[in-house]
From Swiss-Prot:
A biological process from GO: tetrahydrofolate interconversion
Catalytic activity: (6R)-5,10-methylene-5,6,7,8-tetrahydrofolate + glycine + H2O = (6S)-5,6,7,8-tetrahydrofolate + L-serine
HAMAP family: SHMT
Residues the UniProt record annotates as site (Plays an important role in substrate specificity): H228
Residue numbers carrying N6-(pyridoxal phosphate)lysine: K229
Protein name: Serine hydroxymethyltransferase
Purpose: Catalyzes the reversible interconversion of serine and glycine with tetrahydrofolate (THF) serving as the one-carbon carrier. This reaction serves as the major source of one-carbon groups required for the biosynthesis of purines, thymidylate, methionine, and other important biomolecules. Also exhibits THF-independent aldolase activity toward beta-hydroxyamino acids, producing glycine and aldehydes, via a retro-aldol mechanism.
Residues annotated for (6S)-5,6,7,8-tetrahydrofolate binding in this entry: L121, G125, H126, L127, S354, P355, F356
Cofactors demanded by this protein: pyridoxal 5'-phosphate
Amino acid sequence: MFSRDLTLARFDADLFAAMQQEAKRQEDHIELIASENYTSPAVMEAQGSVLTNKYAEGYPGKRYYGGCEYVDVVEQLAIDRAKELFGADYANVQPHAGSQANAAVYLALLSAGDTILGMSLAHGGHLTHGASVSSSGKLYNAVQYGINDQGLIDYDEVERLAVEHKPKMIVAGFSAYSQKLDFARFREIADKVGAYLFVDMAHVAGLVAAGVYPNPVPFADVVTTTTHKTLRGPRGGLILAKKNEEIEKKLNSAVFPGAQGGPLEHVIAAKAVCFKEALQPEFKAYQQQVVKNAQAMAEVFIQRGFDVVSGGTQNHLFLLSLIKQDITGKDADAALGRAHITVNKNSVPNDPRSPFVTSGLRIGTPAVTTRGFGEAECRELAGWICDILDNMGDESVIDAVRGKVEAVCAKFPVYGN
């Protein structure tokens, strides 16, 4: 029998100490990684619940194990809320991650060797959209589209590639693109060549849920997303679709038993919580502020002489090119890290440097907006970053900025009382 008095702090002091240090880092550092956010205590409570003890292979009402009557309720709540949130007829909440959701879509609708047309990783796409190092680029014949000199997707070029290569699936989605996608145009191109349209909205799902970014569900054959990032839930995946019994059956079979075994019901419970949070009126205000904050930061960088890819942003992120300044993304990332500002180095279009070094930074505002930052704080923050980038190697500038970061973090705690 377990004793509730045997806490983690008492049983495993080393692990607990590391966790406490990470909690302190999150409070004391400004988080600008576009794919990161902070979950609510309710999400974490669900994820740390007794649901972690239950095996539940199958789907609600059709399990391979007994004793699933309550996890069925949990999973059905998540399904129903996801469908309501995104206006979908179908939802599968079992994928353990966004990459696994994408793999399940490919498994459901493609055969090995089929052609897919997706956005190039070097131009802002994702590994799972056909990058050569990913299974999506190894199992399928991946053709890639990119962005033009203005940093925008050239839809005529996408159409030309689709007509030339006749893909079975067109993938729309990104990990580093700051403008809105034209889902109607993608649908038109897909229909012209008889391809499935698959949208990966992992980065913008929260914006979509709040109605501040176009919803791909009415246009796509299938949509995937992560449940963290802008959606602010647990780390996990989600598949959505319009009503199509044939596709629904294929997707369910591809997730289980095709790609996964037992679902993580404690994570699914946390997804249900985050979907309920996203259905609240204040979530829309939060997402609107996320975009305003990103736009405010981008404006400051442009005013200070830095190049923002595509000239600005219509979502939660933007790419900062440092080619003109001859600064590597790796060095900029490290310098900002010493000031307790966390970003990630990122390749920019036509980057002359390797992906391990890069010539740019990806900056996103979901996490700082969760803390309570508004446009004023974000403009000030962008100015601090510019000060460091304009004085690379000057540790006194980094020290001064770190002091300002500590003060603003104390003013805007992640988890208040």
